[in-house]
């Protein structure tokens, strides 16, 4: 009989919930980084700069929103399959979500950091010059504050989801426990779910 490491499952669920929350708040923080009037020092009229003026920030909003929904599905599947037989479609779905969700979060956070790691610059097309959004006005500082918070939250969500996936994989492959020689393979597989391509040591 394989003795399951029972703590792995609830801990992975906690990190999934944390990832969902961080991703959702990240999207909300970026969405509120809007309608902040920034005054340029080049004699041009005031310009309202929003997150939608930067493709990387738009991608972050879309990616974190999608990741939130997908991770919610993963949380449901991970929670509902406890105590039930593990069907192949569930495992395949979990593996797919485990690859897609971190990819969305890491790429969106990386793209946002590439644009606004230290400062955020906006290009004034009519005069062909750019200015610092963060330093141009108090409103610009507020805009950048929201953007930076959103970036770090997206990165935190990516780390949380990755750790949840690590615990899930570890539980499938190693955390099912050790198998005793007195039990049959069929009993160990059916009772503790030592499957999914992983083998229990006898």
From Swiss-Prot:
Cytoplasmic side of membrane: 1-10, 78-94, 168-202
On whether Cytoplasm is a keyword of this UniProt record, the answer is: no
Detail the disulphide connectivity of this chain as listed in its UniProt entry: none
* Keywords on record: Cell membrane, Membrane, Transmembrane, Transmembrane helix
Query: Could you tell me the membrane topology recorded for this protein?
Result: Multi-pass membrane protein
Q: Which residues lie on this side of the membrane: Extracellular?
A: 32-56, 116-146
Q: Which family does the record assign?
A: Belongs to the Casparian strip membrane proteins (CASP) family.
Q: How does it assemble?
A: Homodimer and heterodimers.
Report the protein name in the record.
CASP-like protein 1U4
Q: What is the lineage of its organism?
A: Eukaryota, Viridiplantae, Streptophyta, Embryophyta, Tracheophyta
